[in-house]
Amino acid sequence: MTQKTNAHTSEELKELQRYPLELKKQLTASRIRELDMKYDFYVSFSGGKDSAVAVDFTAKILKSLGRKRMYVLNINTGLEYLSVQRFVKLFCEYVSKKYDIEIILETAYPEMSFVDVIKQYGYPIISKEVSQCIYEARKGINPDGTLNGKYSYRYEKLNGTKLDKNGQLSQYNCPQYKFLLDSPIPVSHICCMKVKKDPAYVYEKRTGQIPLIATTCEESRNRKTAWLENGCNAFNCERPKSAPFSFWTNQDMLHYTYEEKMPIAGAYGSIAPKSAMNGQLNMFAELQVMDSCELCTTGCPRTGCVYCLFGITQDPDRILRLQEMEPKRADFVLRGGHFRESDGMWEPTKDGLGYWYVLDVLNENGIKVPYKNAELYRIAK
């Protein structure tokens, strides 16, 4: 069998990421034009800052091509910050007026609730990669604790013994998370599929459109791997899609938003020089030469699903922010939970999702995720 040749190398990605934003805009515009020539497409818009950039920039390019309308799909999972959910329609109206282009916004909803996903599959913890590893490793363990041979490579990764093709320990080994395998917490990567991707697939099948997404290689190893294999316009995949912002960085997204004077959802706060957040301004910030400053948001650095624990090691204060910004939702997330009689595994109850126990297990194993009023949620384990 002939081994597939990657579209790009890691060195090419690093070079692209170093390009100035103006050049990145030109490259992204060319990919959007290529997409427009070959496919009917929609822009996936969560209400987050990166997908807002995708909506704004794509509308600008389509307007320059003489297009009269642009299709936008929002998957309303019900899991985003309320300010993000409300922002979707308002921002589409803003872009439509800004570029004098019709924005046809459609909202889709998941068939399966988040609570049901957790009960049937498990909690999303650490990352998709780690959660999938835990989920599948458990399928390889018999009720008596012996291994049945299924997904043995997942078990090896959790033991830290998996070797790569060169006979070296794999970079994908994750023994630091084996405690999750040994815990009574069900863990799974399937939530995104059930809550986000399945509704998108239904829309795509009905309309014949393919998605333009705002994901970047900087966000995760899986997204970097996908770009290395297929490039921005992955037209030859089983599910064709375009990710024309793949080589943009978080700083690029922030600078574009600032330069365009775009509104952002309230959960982010505002965009400001990072030095100002530390109580001091550098020379460029004082002169308001913002293109030379490192920017940040004064609120959430990222939004996404507020109940999701993917990326929690990079953003450990996520639950604290939720407690401050939306205390009633935070209370439901933390409260409740019990051990199932059938197998002793932890699951949500009608009182809440039971995250207090999940966070306690993480904290006990060196992954510090603070939350307030812990004593109010804890029960006898």
Q: What is the predicted function of each stretch?
A:
Residues T2-D252:
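ATP-dependent adenylation/nucleotidyltransferase module used to activate substrates
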Residues T2-K14, C237-E238, N250-K381:
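ATP/NTP-dependent adenylation/nucleotidyl-transfer catalytic domains that generate, transfer
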